[in-house]
Curated annotation (Swiss-Prot):
Pfam families reported in the protein's UniProt record: His_biosynth
BP GO terms, sorted: L-histidine biosynthetic process
HAMAP family: HisF
Keywords on record: Amino-acid biosynthesis, Cytoplasm, Histidine biosynthesis, Lyase
UniProt family annotation: Belongs to the HisA/HisF family.
NCBIfam families associated with the record: hisF
UniProt source species: Clostridium beijerinckii (strain ATCC 51743 / NCIMB 8052) (Clostridium acetobutylicum)
Name this protein carries in UniProt: Imidazole glycerol phosphate synthase subunit HisF
GO MF, one example: lyase activity
Enzyme class: lyase
Annotated function: IGPS catalyzes the conversion of PRFAR and glutamine to IGP, AICAR and glutamate. The HisF subunit catalyzes the cyclization activity that produces IGP and AICAR from PRFAR using the ammonia provided by the HisH subunit.
Known pathway: Amino-acid biosynthesis; L-histidine biosynthesis; L-histidine from 5-phospho-alpha-D-ribose 1-diphosphate: step 5/9
Amino acid sequence: MHTKRIIPCLDVKEGRVVKGINFEGLVDVGDPVALAEYYNKQGADELVFLDITATHEKRGIMEKVVQSVAEKIFIPFTVGGGLQTLDDIKSILRAGADKVSLNSAAVRNKMLIKEGAFYFGSQCIVLAADAKKRSDNTGWNVVINGGRIDTGLDLLKWIEEATALGAGEILLTSMDADGTKKGFDLELTKAVSDITNVPVIASGGCGCLEDFYDVFKSNIADAALAASLFHYGELTVDEVKRYLHDKNVSVRI
C-alpha cells in the first residue's frame, strides 16, 4: 500500500479564508498564510486552496496569496477555482502553486487539460470532478458551478477522457455525501479508482476518524481531503495520522 495523504482544504475569497474556521490560539483565522502554516505544522501532506472569488478582476489577489503561502510552507499545494485559460494556470504556478485544479473550465474546454499537461506536465494538472448520483441509480453525472449545473456528462466516461488528455490526479467530490459527515462515498470512489491509474483524492462527507480508515483500508483512494472537520478543530491532521498508523495504514508521521 502506498503512503496515504491527508489534505485539508481551504476556501479563499478575495484573499481571505471563508467558511467558519474555529482555531484556538490563531489570531487571524481568515489569513490563508497563517492557516497554511498551522496545517503544515500539524503534518498535512498537502493543502488545497479553492478560490471562490466570483470575479476575474480579483484573480491578482489570489496570486499574491499563493506567493505568500509558497514562501512559508514546504508541502505541495494545489490551487483551483476559476482558472479558465493557460495564462491563468501559468500565473498561479509561477506564483508558487505546485498543482492546479480544473473543474468547470475543463468541462467547457477539455483542451485546457491537454494544453496544461503539455506545457506544465501531467503532475501539475488535477481534475476536480464533482459527482452526483443519477436518480435512476445507474451511475453518476458530472455537476459544475458548485453543484448547481448538471452537465449530463457521465462521470466515469469524463474521468477516462480527462486522464487520456493528461490529467495526472483526480480530486473526486461526492455532492451527495458532501456536508453530511456520514463518511466518504465508497461506492463512487471505488468506481473511479477501478477505471483509472492516476491517484484519486476522496472528498465529501468525512465526519470522523473511522471514515478515513474506511476509504483507505480497501485501497480505493490515495488521499483523503477534509475541510470543516479540521477547521472546527474536531480533529487534527496529526490525530488522523496516528489513528491510521495504529490501524496499519501507511502514512507519513
